[in-house]
Each structure stands twice: as C-alpha cells, then as structure tokens.
Amino acid sequence: IQTYPICDPISGVIELIADSRFDGAIMLNQEGKRFVEELERRDVLSEAILKQTGNYCWVLWNDNIGKISNTVKEHPTEYEAFTKQGIMATCPDLKCIADFTKMPLKQLESTVKRVSSMAGKGNDKDFHHRGGLMDMSEGQYYVIKAVPSTHHTMGGVRINEKAQALTAKGQVIPGLWAAGEVTGVTHGTNRLGGNAY
C-alpha cells in the first residue's frame, strides 16, 4: 500500500486544507519540533510521522503562507468540519497554538523563530527544504492534526517486460496484458503517480 501522510486522524480522509505544506507550512511533532523535510515523498513522510510521539503530527502555517496556498478559502467545508471536530484551530499567536495542541510553548516559539530565520537566509540547515521555508514570525496561525492513512493499493497482476499478464508460476497468460494501477510489479516503494487515473 501507499499511505498519504496528512489525513484526518478520525476518518483517514486526506486533509486537502493541509496542502499548505506545499507552500511552506511546517510539520511538527508533539514536542514542537520539525522532524522531516515537509516535501519528502509520501512514504518517507508517513514513516517519519509514525516514529513521533502518538504517531501523528501537527501541520502549522500562517497567513504569510495562507495567502499563497489559499487552502482555507479553497476548502471551507473541511475548515469548518475539522475545526468543529477539534483537530484544527485558527489562532492569533503561538501561545494559542500551544494551548490548543499542548505543545510546549518555548519549544514551539524556538522552532518558528528558527524556521523564520532560515527562511530569511534562504537556507534550511535542518532538513534542506527544497521549496524554501517561509517567514512564520507573525500570525494569524493555522494548525491541524494529521496522521498517515492508506491512500493507494500497489498490488495487482504480475506482468513481464512486455506487459503480458503472468500466472502465479510466472507463465504468460496468452492474450492478456495489464498496465497502470492493475499491475503489481511496477511501483517499487512508492506509487507511480502518472499511472493513477
């Protein structure tokens, strides 16, 4: 299977509102620390999250990032549902974020200060964020709790190099070919996104 790293802890549904991650949102553990480069592959992110306290993370962004990603405006139903569910909050400052998430305020402030400093220098010394970090020194802030969840099954019919379907013993099944998501030997450790339709 492939997991998607940023999903609702209750239903397992992908949190599209947290796509702010692609525009600079950071992922924090319960201790208030970054633990992975936020644009890593889905399997790498999922594994990293599962190694954190409670097997979840918090995705944090501010209006500086929100103006780029526009996820709150693009996904108002999610915003309302996740807020009502108690896994998302909008806060004027980091103290409010710490109160909501139960992260230690001093560590949270230290992390955000470091991220903002590295953003200003254009150099993420901790995880080498390939998209570039953003200044998060001022609110308004948004935070959502997230867990990995099953996203895609990467199993299927075995095929040979000609895309001919094979029996369990590796023999060609005459007249039967397979391609895309029905195949089970082409994905490796991560789904080939171009095959998903």
What are these regions (language model features)?
Residues 1-197:
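Residues forming the flavin
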